[in-house]
Amino acid sequence: MPEGGNNYPVSNYRYGMTWDGLLAPHRGVDLANDEGTPVVAIGPGTVHYAGDDSTQRFAFIKEFYGNLVILQLDQRWNERPLFALYAHLSAIEVESGQAVAAGELLGAVGQSGAALAPHLHLEIRIDDPANYMMVRNPELWYSPLSGAGVLAGRVLDRQGRFVPGQLVEIICPDGGRRWVETYWNQRTLPDEVMSENFVFGDIPEMECTAQAEMDGVMLRQPAQISAQHIAFVVLQLPAN
């Protein structure tokens, strides 16, 4: 979102989370904003699709995203194509095939499709822009706010397996409450290189601690958050 818009994802429904078990694991992030708030490109690219999903399916059903824009990013991942999907728009300001720069206007926040309130739903898709399952965590792909960075990591059991739905708290000296849950199931895909199962973006530059309590054991790891960088931690139960 441009300056003045909200860039913080809804806390209960970050990528891979379920809103306290009420919803399916999230395929992207939701940025709550007033209807009509400008939506801009997260990076340079070419508009792959601009329209609605009444006749073409981009999720498990039609008319799910409403008005949407899919941007094929100039950036690639290991030579694989990347796409940013912007959904539930109230207006679309670009056309298919149009080249756009980072920060260029794409449309406006709305609540079209299955949205219950105005917000931007943002996804990152890899390889196939129409495949609902080929998503990755958007917080790894859009730039943090100025002076902020990203914390990603793995929470593992004693055998080194991902622990689903685990609360991770991020304790920082500014006193802000930051928390996230690990991805809820194996269909929520991590980055193939990073192999994370949680991400929390837009943390101001400072030293923080990631902590999670499992089986009565409090696990803690320090993390130095640096502007425009991704810090990484591993929280694993010790072997018996």
Language-model features and meaning:
Residues 1-68, 74-76, 102, 111, ...:
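Surface-exposed, glycine-biased beta-strand/turn segments
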Residues 167-191:
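Short amphipathic beta-strand segments in non-cytosolic proteins
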Residues 49, 88-91, 108-111, 157, ...:
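A residue-level detector for short acidic-glycine micro-motifs
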